[in-house]
Amino acid sequence: MMNASCSPNTQNSIDSDWVCRVRAVRKISKGEEITDTYVSTMANTLYRRRQLKALKYFDCGCKRCADPTELGSHFSTLLCRIKNCGGFLLCRDPLVSSSPWACLKCGAEVDGEQVKREQEQWEERVEAAPRLIPDQEKLLAALKQLFHPNHNLCMDVMFNLAPLYGVRGSKAEDLVSEAEKKEKMCGELLSTMEQVIPGGFRMRGMLLVERHTTKLFLLRTQLETKQCSKSTFVRNVASLRAPLAEAVKILGLEPPGSLESARLVQAEKYLAQVDSIVENAGKTLLPAGTE
């Protein structure tokens, strides 16, 4: 086994010949430990350490697990239960599962076992919730009453919601509103991921493509409804190239036949389209159906 970290600097993939390939997802300095993860990096500390203990038989003490804020991401942070406080509850010692949680603002404490039970109950609710926009939005609103908006349970629901927005079958008048929500959600997910797992992870590549299609749809809508000039449209489309090129670079490292490699084909098509629009100085509008 490679050394474990919940914010690893490598990622592996297994190809059709069952060869496991490990690659760096960010620069690894000389002498720096090379690490991998054995649990979902998009889970909170309580869940990750519980799973690692049960399945891999060790107590993780990595930098992320030891930090109550999870590297500043607040991936585990709760909201204070004292009415009108508005403070954040952090675990006093994340490496001790029964450790109490304390509010940074008022100092109120909550028993660690109570927090564990509460989170497990909400994990079950998130898992069981219907994958429909109204149900997921209602669940997200409820979670944000108890957890920091960056908490992994909120992130999980956002991952569920984002693909539901703007799908075929949505009412025409809802498409723009849903696209705006989707773009904002993708941005929030990418920002939080950059804190807990910085680097070229496949999940980042997939999200960058998802956000690109949404941004492209919104820009096209602005042009068609005369909310922007052609020159502004072209300039804004040009700004989409860098993140899309990053996605192509990330997904290009995934094995053939994988979901990510299929997404790569789409990303390359979108990249060529962006280049064509910019090169033609906005004279050619986007082909139909590219949203």
Where are these regions (language model features)?
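C-terminal SET catalytic tail plus cysteine-rich post-SET Zn-binding segment of SAM-dependent SET-domain
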Residues: 4-143, 149
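Amphipathic alpha-helical repeat scaffolds of TPR domains
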Residues: 115-141, 150-171, 202-223, 265-277
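Helix-turn-helix repeat elements of alpha-solenoid scaffolds
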Residues: 127-139, 175-188, 236-244
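Amphipathic alpha-helical segments of tetratricopeptide repeats
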Residues: 140-145, 163, 184-194, 245-252
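Helix N-cap/loop-to-helix boundary motif
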Residues: 144-158, 172-176, 194-205, 230, ...
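Acidic, serine/threonine/proline-rich low-complexity intrinsically disordered regions
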Residues: 167-183, 221-238
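Eukaryote-biased recognition of C-terminal alpha-helical segments
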Residues: 213, 248-291
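TPR/TPR-like (Sel1-like) alpha-helical repeat modules
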Residues: 232-255
